[in-house]
C-alpha cells in the first residue's frame, strides 16, 4: 500500500478523542500508526478500503439502530436520508419503468402464445420487475369504445404535432454542399476529394466578392 494512502486512511480512521473539558484532541502518533497498520491488514485494495469506510461510517451505524425514529434530536434531513436508505435497502436510485399500453398487450400476447414463459423471463425482456408482469397478466381491464376513441384521438394529435415540427422549413432545408479539391505533387489535374455539408451562418452575405471569385474559379475548373 502506498504511504500517501496509508496516511490518508490513518487520518480518516484515527478520529478524535473527546477530552473531559469537551475539547477535541487528536490521537497520539502511536495510535495513528497502530490504526494505519490495522487498516492495511483489513483492506488490501482500494475497493476494500471504500467498503471498510462505508461500513464504519456514522450514518451506517445510525441506520442499523432503530433509535433514530424515536430520537427527537435527529435532524429532519438526516431522518429523511435514513428513511430512504431503509426503504431502498442500500440500493442505488433506480426508478421503475412504466410500460405503454402496446407493451402491455405484447406481454399478454406472449403469455397467451407461450404459456410456459415465466414472469421472470418476461420481466428480463421488458426490463421491469416480475411483479409488474404479474399485475399486467392478472389485470382484466380492457378499454371500451369511448376510451379507445380518446386514445386514438390523442395519438393523432401527437402525430400531427410531430409532422408540423418535421415539416417546417427549418427542418426541410438542407445545408449547402462544399467541394474539397486537391491534387498530388506530380498530378496536374484537380480531383474532388470529398463533399461536405456546411451550415450557413446567420447574417452572412453570400454575394461577397470573395465568394464570387470562388464560384468563378469552381465553374472554370468544372467546365
UniProtKB/Swiss-Prot annotation:
It is found in: Mitochondrion. InterPro entries: NGRN/Rrg9 (IPR010487). Keywords: Mitochondrion, Transit peptide. The keyword Mitochondrion applies. It comes from Lachancea thermotolerans (strain ATCC 56472 / CBS 6340 / NRRL Y-8284) (Yeast). Required for respiratory activity and maintenance and expression of the mitochondrial genome. This is Required for respiratory growth protein 9, mitochondrial. Residues 166-223 are annotated as: Disordered. Belongs to the RRG9 family.
Amino acid at each position: 500500500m502506498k504511504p500517501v494512502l496509508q496516511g490518508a486512511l490513518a487520518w480518516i480512521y484515527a478520529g478524535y478523542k473527546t477530552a473531559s473539558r469537551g475539547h477535541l484532541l487528536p490521537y497520539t502518533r502511536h495510535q495513528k500508526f497502530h490504526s494505519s497498520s490495522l487498516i492495511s491488514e483489513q483492506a488490501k485494495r482500494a475497493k476494500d478500503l471504500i467498503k471498510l469506510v462505508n461500513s464504519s461510517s456514522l450514518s451506517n451505524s445510525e441506520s442499523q439502530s432503530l433509535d433514530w425514529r424515536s430520537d427527537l434530536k435527529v435532524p429532519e434531513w438526516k431522518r429523511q436520508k435514513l428513511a430512504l436508505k431503509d426503504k431502498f435497502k442500500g440500493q442505488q436510485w433506480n426508478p421503475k419503468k412504466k410500460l405503454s399500453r402496446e407493451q402491455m398487450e405484447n406481454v399478454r400476447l406472449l403469455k397467451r402464445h407461450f404459456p410456459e414463459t415465466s414472469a421472470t423471463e418476461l420481466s428480463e425482456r421488458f426490463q421491469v420487475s416480475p411483479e409488474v408482469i404479474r399485475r399486467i397478466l392478472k389485470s382484466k381491464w380492457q378499454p371500451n369504445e369511448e376510451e379507445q376513441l380518446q386514445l386514438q384521438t390523442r395519438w393523432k394529435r401527437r402525430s400531427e404535432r410531430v409532422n408540423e415540427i418535421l415539416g417546417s422549413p427549418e427542418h426541410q432545408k438542407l445545408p449547402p454542399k462544399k467541394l474539397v479539391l486537391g491534387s498530388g505533387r506530380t498530378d496536374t489535374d484537380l480531383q474532388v476529394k470529398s463533399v461536405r455539408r456546411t451550415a450557413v451562418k446567420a447574417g452572412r452575405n453570400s454575394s461577397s466578392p470573395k465568394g464570387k471569385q470562388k464560384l468563378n474559379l469552381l465553374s472554370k475548373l468544372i467546365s
